[in-house]
Amino acid sequence: MIPAAVKDALTNNYASYVRPFLWYSGENKELLAREIRAIAASGAKEFVFENRGGDWFGTDFWWDIFGFTLDYAKSLNLRVWSIDDSHVNTGSANDSLHKEENAQYRAVNLRLDMVDAAGPLTGGAFSLPGHTENEKIVQISAFRRDLDSGNSYGEALDLTDCVQDGLLVADIPDGVWRIYYVMTTDPERHGLFGKYITMMSKDSCRHLINETHEKMYEHFADYFGNTFAGFFSDEPAFGNCDGQYGPNAYNLRLGMIDKMFPWWHDFPQRLAEKCNSTPEDVMKKLPALWDSVDEVSASLRLAYMDLVTELWQKNFSEQLGKWCEEHNVEYIGHNLEDADAHMRTGWGCGHYFRSMKGQHMSGMDIVFEQLTPGISTVDHAMNTASRTRSSTFYHYTLPKLAASLAHITPHMKNRALSEIFGATGWTCGLTNMYSLFNHTLICGINNYVPHAYAIPVPQVFESHQDRENAAGSVTPPGYCLTYLPPTFHAGGYNPQYKVFCDIIKYVQRVCHITSTAQHKPDLAVYYCAESDWMNCGSYRSMDDVSMKLIRSGYDFEFLPLETILNEAAAVNGKLAVNNEQYKALILPMSEIIPEALLKKIAEFADSNIKVFFTDALPVRTENGAVDASLLKNIHVLPWATLTTELAAAVSHDFAVAPAQNDLRHYAFTDQNGTDGVMLFNSSLKPIEFTLPGRNHLVYDPWANKLYRLNGNTLQLTAQKIVVVYNDLAQSDLELYPTLPEKYSELDLDYNIFVRSATEKEFKLLRGNSKAVNLNIAEKLTRFCGEFRYESTFECNNANMTTLIIPNAGDAAELFVNGISCGTAFGPYCIFNIKGALKNGINTLQINTFDSPAYADRKGDKNIGWGSGFPLRAHGFTGSIMLG
């Protein structure tokens, strides 16, 4: 029996899972239509219209262009989404907050200044800290300081009413005191975010809807729910930062004295309710958000972050989601997740799960060179201002966050979306695209927004006709027709576009299988945002835990606090949420955890749920020392021995022998109750292992073929995904291809033909030549095109099944005796040539495809971000192997 989803995939009969961005920067309708046709040719069935570089949103020009887009898409049976603001980041409300009439919707933030004083001091005064006319001091408090720890402590003095004539006129008792000045911030301190909406106000978020969503509906109501699919939020933010996207953009936590934090006029009352206190008491203790105040900081910070993330969820995400539902469309998008921004303010969203609760799909992005195949356990350098990034976060944590949110949120229908490729540059060619897709597919991502299609033709390819075709395009003063590589079609000049379209179809096949199935994880892992919020002790990074578990052969999902408290249940010795079940709950070590969490996990442990902390047990909650009786059935997994001790306590549902650190798996049950597992070799070398079970059916989604396994041993080549079903193989299926033990080296001479990206015909570049480095031999360091290698060789064993090009560039397509053997990804291209060889003379044709990386470099219209990946070779070099 072939599973139904696999049957669909074999015939490319799948739903829509890929919706690329279409970057629009003022081009005319003819060029816009050309790019929409290119999207349709890729196999994508929808796209996201992304406004870039123009101030025309909401003008007659915009309505005309977007109306044309909808009509043309409809004629091609495509659906259209739209970014939900005039530009990235979502929240400018079409730049309407620059108008003073909308000033009431602008964000309010607080900052801190302070001075230390040794008392007693009587009859004197203190100068107020410098502040602009747009800043107002809202609270002045003083705390004693502990001269051993440096922390503040004790009862606060409220000095707010002691200001006279620009001075703080107050007596200070005996001891060392720290005087804190809490004030609103000048919007000028926040750069672009100074004129943005605030998630702290329902009315402010509604203003965004009024300026974008309602106006779109007014003009295009007839398209809503059919051709028009919905809205995409792109990196909305709290905005309590300087608005500069630099190396310190994400490092914004409570407990950092120099930072600014969101505020609103009703916060004193709201915080008082959460703290079981009074507004006056909350204001007096407010400096504990910034500085360490014993017995105050943890509880106040927890309450504060609980409040601001709750407001984001209700005011922004759920309000937008509800509006979309009421208008028969859907709401998708993602926030800025990098470097723990997903649980912090500033550029971040404070709480990954809450921030997208109103969306109809979870969201994330992999852009720049954030995820580099082959580098997964150490930080890696990037060609951006932040210089280095955490490989572990992008490989092991971020995609699992997105999949987890989709799986535990019923209205998301298991749909986890990732924007992908943005700003990775032309060096992100076919091989990297294939790998990046696979690294996220294996985590459960099943919807994608590839970034991007862009209409401008790179100048190096641009012809006189292209310039004439661009006539009528419109750009406001100070703007230009720009693009951000990779732009997949590149006006028809990208030699890789044909294979890119094949990749899109491949991704849709894999997404179809996982989208129609129920995930079967081993474990649940606590999403420890609260530990980061309180910032009152050490804790084990979720990234460390993610990497350790995955490389130990476990699959898992993250659960946030409110899910653990309100939705998780003990069912037959397992933890259950929605349709997911987990054999154990793992909590990253934290010195301090929320008291409500401690009580709940103790309840689970008493119900025979296995509950573990990594490293050590917590020592306190926001309310004081831990009640030791609550920990009696909770266990510790020492970090050094976590893998072995966890394996002794919790069995793997799926395990291979020998264990493979680089093998990733995603187990599932399909709609008919058939169990399957998706496997991914995340390394850059082939791996071999023995599968559990027998009579395995293997689906190769790239080749789009079914195989049976010879015994239980499976070989997976580098960066490859297969889907395996136990006990379903049919005897008439071809055996899954394996790598031969021995190879013959073929050091052939080739006729090497070339076609540049701007030419239609191939011409001979080198005759009777070895496969040499063309950058050196032909000085092709500014070239982009296709290469065709033609040769012949003699064979006396037509039963050989494998041809390998060990030193290929981005990708290669192989024909043996005119028979297509498919396309493989570099640099180590492996082809199944079974049945293509014959005894005697054989013909060989190898086609390769450049990305525009060598030719179209930074400058001109190319914004030029993302050049961190290596430029891959033209064609290939050296011998090939036959076995």
Where are these regions (language model features)?
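Short, surface-exposed tryptophan/glycine-enriched loops
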Residues: 794-795, 829-841, 852
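Short, well-structured beta-strand segments enriched in hydrophobic/aromatic residues
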Residues: 721-723, 801, 839-856
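Exposed low-complexity, polar/acidic, P/S/T/G-rich flexible segments that act as propeptides
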Residues: 856-883
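Short acidic/polar inter-strand loop motif in beta-rich domains
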Residues: 186-188, 730-731, 849-857
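Acidic/aromatic-lined carbohydrate-recognition and catalytic surfaces
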Residues: 49-165, 170-171, 179-206, 221
